[in-house]
From Swiss-Prot:
Pfam families: AAA_26. GO terms for molecular function: ATP binding; dethiobiotin synthase activity; magnesium ion binding. It is found in: Cytoplasm. This is ATP-dependent dethiobiotin synthetase BioD. Belongs to the dethiobiotin synthetase family. CDD domains: DTBS. Pathway: Cofactor biosynthesis; biotin biosynthesis; biotin from 7,8-diaminononanoate: step 1/2. It is an enzyme of class 6 (ligase). GO terms for cellular component: cytosol. ATP binds at residues 12-17, 51, 112-115, 202-204. Coiled coil: none annotated. It comes from Bacillus subtilis subsp. natto. The gene is bioD.
């Protein structure tokens, strides 16, 4: 299976915007792409503003909202915690079983995690365990601001300790008038982590299909991305 697992150094770093943009970019280059975001918290998967809806719209997949996101919870918390509040526990086997049912429906997949790679998804597993099981290279979405060097370095080193392949890092959310830290962080992160920067993307005032696709086309290194995916 070709594709990527998109994770982040934190929550609210723009994983879904990047994931959906990558899916649209691959689609525009004639790739048969599907999307999978197994967990969603705090919003209905069918809501037009949900991560699931954006992923579905941008990828143009025929997969249903339930196919894309089989496990959804009401509380805006880590999936394991949100599930416990509802008396629900999702096992690793359930996540992988659902993946097995949809993975053959597309040539490649963009899979999006929940928060960072250490977020608990169930009683005895984290996002990192799902990444390892799916065997997809990671794309790490990181903030551009002060503090991101440490967060990104720790994410990379933990991933390496788990034997997880890392395709690259995307620095997301650069402001219109970047401070000195925003200007220098990408180069420092690439040097310290030894992982390629796939792109440095701006903060979007409005998230639409058009603005997201325009952003990734202008700011993501497509040739490097394709090379990391082996196409």
């Amino acid at each position: 299976m070709r594709g990527f697992f998109v994770t982040g150094t934190d929550t609210e770093v723009g994983k879904t915007v990047i994931s959906s943009g990558l899916a649209a970019l691959l689609k525009e280059h004639n790739r048969d792409v599907g999307v999978y975001k197994p967990f969603l918290s705090g919003i209905s998967r069918h809501h037009p503003d949900s991560d699931t809806s954006l992923l579905k719209d941008m990828s143009q997949t025929s997969l249903s909202h339930e196919d894309i996101t089989p496990f959804a919870f009401k509380a805006p918390l880590a999936p394991y915690v949100a599930g416990k509040l509802e008396g629900k526990t999702v096992t690793m086997e359930e996540v992988l079983s659902h993946w097995g049912r949809i993975r053959e429906k597309h040539e490649c997949f963009i899979v999006e995690g929940a928060g960072g790679i250490s977020v608990p998804l169930g009683e005895d597993y984290l996002v990192s365990h799902v990444i390892k099981a799916l065997q997809l290279p990671m794309i790490i979405v990181a903030r551009p601001h002060l503090g991101t060097i440490n967060h990104t370095f720790l994410t990379v080193k933990y991933a390496e300790s788990m034997g997880l392949p890392i395709a690259g890092i995307i620095i997301n959310g650069i402001s219109d008038s970047p401070d000195e830290d925003e200007k220098t962080n990408p180069e420092m992160i690439e040097r310290l982590c030894g992982v390629p920067i796939l792109g440095v993307t701006p903060k979007l005032a409005n998230v639409t299909k058009e603005t997201v696709l325009h952003m990734v086309k202008d700011h993501i290194n497509l040739s490097l991305l394709m090379n990391q995916m082996g196409v």
